[in-house]
Swiss-Prot record:
Record-linked PROSITE patterns: AA_TRANSFER_CLASS_2
InterPro entries hit by this protein: Aminotrans_II_pyridoxalP_BS, Aminotransferase_I/II_large, HisP_aminotrans, PyrdxlP-dep_Trfase, PyrdxlP-dep_Trfase_major, PyrdxlP-dep_Trfase_small
Lineage: Bacteria, Bacillati, Actinomycetota, Actinomycetes, Mycobacteriales
Signal peptide from the UniProt entry: none
Protein name: Histidinol-phosphate aminotransferase
Post-translational modification N6-(pyridoxal phosphate)lysine, affected residues: K232
Superkingdom of origin: Bacteria
Keyword Cell inner membrane among record annotations: no
Catalytic activity: L-histidinol phosphate + 2-oxoglutarate = 3-(imidazol-4-yl)-2-oxopropyl phosphate + L-glutamate
HAMAP family: HisC_aminotrans_2 (MF_01023)
Any one GO biological process: L-histidine biosynthetic process
Keyword Disulfide bond: no
UniProt cofactor(s): pyridoxal 5'-phosphate
Length: 377
């Protein structure tokens, strides 16, 4: 018997607004092919592993001391990386880092959201946005995307003007549908905002065919924050490092809400080592894009409806019963993601042999799992 197991969550004085909520989480199952969390399937190079090992070892010698509270060296390295990637001249004062981009988003809502304030998102999109809004007691508003899951900019502009949210979430490329938002559309959204901050979630930005929204920060310094992560293209999911790019005043706001010494010295050392090997790691992006296009074509030829993607995943359907189909993929040793969109499932782009396994399973399932209206096409 586990100590204390006689009580349940209902017995605790939980906040009323959290009762009935479900925690975020993708299934963590031991199966031959895992394509459900949008990780980079290519492991770090031996040179990177050696560099991380050496760097963490050096940091470990100082574990009796607190880490650099503001992670200045890491933020400087992130600025250098983005200078090269975006062509925008950034400095350490433009960067903030935390334990994954979810902590970055939480800190943003702690600073700019909260009771009496609201945030809007265009759904379906990243499911952590409303969860973080709930956790910070920020009122969550939402508007629908277009039928193809793309962002309907005209509708978004109208919703922003009518509802006047304090925060606007835009994900580019969008998770789970994969479409990127062009800079001209971002400008329209920003121009529609009389006040408030647009949080541009670029977790999959390295895969995108569109320029980064970082290019617009100087034009909209009070309105735009760009959130990014090292968990996806950077193959650093286990390292848990997210960051944001914004005007220096936004970084000052982060200092007001961050917990002291929130980034361990080991995390900072490992992330800096990973950044030193950025070129080698990100060489896998082109391979993953080619595989994405191959998988999309293969699924289309089988008769599936494939949502065009600008990321390292594909949303596809239409299934008569998506949860049941998800289980049938799992029965064949392929773990993909049921993201809660009726009729659709999402697959990460993995290694070539993993993608082959997905296509093989799809070929077996196509005759029985597609919705009747689509199966007749």
């Amino acid at each position: 018997m586990t100590v204390g197991e006689r009580i349940t969550l209902a017995d605790l004085p939980l906040r009323d607004d959290l009762r009935g909520k479900s925690p975020y989480g993708a299934p963590q199952l031991q199966v031959p092919v895992r394509l459900n969390t949008n990780e980079n399937p290519h492991p770090p190079s031996q040179a990177l592993v050696d560099d991380v090992t050496r760097s963490v070892g050096e940091a470990a010698a100082e574990l009796h001391r607190y880490p650099d509270r503001d992670a200045v060296a890491l933020r400087s390295d992130l600025a250098d990386y983005l200078n090269l990637r975006t062509g925008v001249e950034l400095s350490v004062e433009n960067l903030w880092a935390a334990n994954g981009s979810n902590e970055v988003l939480q800190q943003l809502l702690q600073a700019f959201g909260g009771p009496g304030r609201s945030a809007i998102g265009f759904v379906p999109s990243y499911s952590m946005h409303p969860i973080i809004a709930d956790a910070t007691r920020t009122e969550w508003l939402q508007a629908l995307r277009a039928d193809d899951f793309g962002l309907d900019v005209d509708t978004a502009v109208r919703e922003i003007a009518a509802r006047r949210p304090d925060l606007v979430f835009v994900t580019s490329p969008n998770n789970p549908s994969g479409q990127s938002v062009p800079l001209e559309d971002l400008r329209r959204l920003l121009d529609a905002m009389e006040t408030g901050i647009l949080i541009l979630d670029e977790a999959y930005g390295e895969f995108s065919s569109q320029p980064s929204g970082v290019a617009l920060i100087d034009q909209y310094p009070t309105k735009l924050v760009v959130s990014r992560t090292m968990s996806k293209a950077f193959a650093f999911a286990g390292g848990r490092l997210g960051y944001l790019v914004a005007a220096p005043a936004v970084i000052e706001a982060m200092l007001l809400v961050r917990l002291p010494y929130h980034l361990s010295s080991l995390t900072q050392a490992a992330a800096r080592a990973a950044l030193r090997h950025a070129d080698d790691t990100l060489a896998s992006v082109a391979t993953l894009i080619a595989e994405r296009d191959r998988v999309a074509n293969g699924l289309s030829q089988l008769g599936f409806r494939v949502v065009p993607s600008d990321a390292n995943f594909i949303l596809f359907g239409e299934f008569a019963d998506a949860p049941a189909t998800w289980r049938r993929y799992l029965d064949q040793g392929v773990l993909i993601r049921d993201v809660g969109i009726p009729g659709y499932l999402r697959t990460t782009i993995g290694l070539a042999e993993e993608n082959d396994a997905l296509l093989t399973a799809s070929a077996r399932l196509v005759e029985t799992e597609l919705a009747a209206t689509l199966g007749a096409l």
